[in-house]
Amino acid sequence: MNKNVMVKGLTALTILTILTSLGFAENISNQPHSIAKAEKNVKEITDATKEPYNSVVAFVGGTGVVVGKNTIVTNKHIAKSNDIFKNRVSAHHSSKGKGGGNYDVKDIVEYPGKEDLAIVHVHETSTEGLNFNKNVSYTKFADGAKVKDRISVIGYPKGAQTKYKMFESTGTINHISGTFMEFDAYAQPGNSGSPVLNSKHELIGILYAGSGKDESEKNFGVYFTPQLKEFIQNNIEK
């Protein structure tokens, strides 16, 4: 991998910080991470109980998005790294709003191709006794996207360091080729798996990496082609 390309999840090479309020553990990266040349239109989402924010979940070191019954889409490297600590996700946690509960992971289905895409199924009842599907919304798929479309990225950058505050950034699609897309919405470690949404809050894809010398100048996502959408839809719990 190019040394200037970094995935947006937090690595497992650092000190483990226990976040009892979320019910799972988080590792904090020692490496410097920030983004310079990406468009920096960022706002904190303090109340994540409404759409599209209540479809976003926090993983250990990353983010995911709910697409159906007990079903979350994220990156392979986030789904795998979650096994290192605890198999648990937190539904739309935010600094002021009511969270949707903490849910244990049931199983993981990785996309068989090269794309950094995985499906995570969770148990329906949270550790607090909440029902997953009554506390989240399901994000709809976009029909497609094109260069210069405006987008938003929602997730948990620097999760433990920000006490899992949710942030939304906006930007523009710069390039699409096959299942690859490049855009300039601001992102940081912890944004891996974050949904990339169009202006209608429909799901275009998920973020997986960024590129830059000291700071990320570009961000990359898995673009949901019809083939990828079919894979996801076939793995939504019935």
From Swiss-Prot:
Subcellular localization(s) per the UniProt record: Secreted
EC number: 3.4.21.-
Cellular component terms per the entry's GO annotation: extracellular region
Signal peptide start-end: 1-38
Induction of expression: Negatively regulated by sigma-B factor.
Molecular functions per Gene Ontology: serine-type endopeptidase activity
Catalytic residues as annotated in Swiss-Prot or TrEMBL: H77 (charge relay system), D116 (charge relay system), S192 (charge relay system)
Pfam families: Trypsin
Entry superkingdom: Bacteria
GO biological process: proteolysis
Gene3D superfamilies tied to this protein: Trypsin-like serine proteases
Keywords: Hydrolase, Protease, Secreted, Serine protease, Signal
InterPro entries per UniProt: Peptidase_S1_PA, Peptidase_S1_PA_chymotrypsin, Peptidase_S1B, Peptidase_S1B_tx, Trypsin_dom, V8_his_AS
Family annotation (PANTHER family): PROTEASE DO-LIKE 5, CHLOROPLASTIC (PTHR43019:SF23), SERINE ENDOPROTEASE DEGS (PTHR43019)
Family under the similarity heading: Belongs to the peptidase S1B family.
The name this protein goes by in its record: Serine protease SplA
